[in-house]
């Protein structure tokens, strides 16, 4: 299949409309020698076979076609006197969050049964290869210094709206004496990406291979165990935690690079972690 060609699985799984783009085979340098030891050494990886990857993260609506009871809940505001729980996270088009790795894999299994295709989570090799889309930088669109406003939904000036006060909470004014105590999260105050929380997939620019929100919006589970580099397929199955890749609306760009890794236990449900799926030939 041609790079960037599209496939939709609506015809095979009634009620589930998901668009996929073709990711080619190839080789690249994975990881980085700058920064934390958990993503070094930089080392060559080969992606032997092309695959299809979901162009956006799995939404609440898509996830509920298989798990109708799923509740992404809300994002808690930074204040104490609440009459409501916070900002909504359950809108149908928002990416599903608080999905454990085990639930994400169960979703893949059910979707495989419905479609007759091999649906799964990407390995972290497949994820980084697809994210980079031919780029060798910190982001598919540039470096840590690039204004990410039109490319990814990361921690920008809108995050200051998490600082609210009042019984029916409203964002604090910058002159409020409490303001500095509730706007402590690392963020790029000079960048405006238009949104505070996770939003419907596809609202920002796609990378060169047609994938949206790879480094922002919500972070994403991979199928891989969290083990020291260099990555080795033979040692998979020996770790207890699973690798999560990409940044989120709540992450500073430094924690959202093409090579940045974080990990959680397979049963953990995390407020800024969702997933996207791949289809293997």
State each model region's role.
Residues 29, 33-34, 81-262, 266-271:
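Functional-site microenvironments in short loops/helix caps that host divalent-cation chemistry
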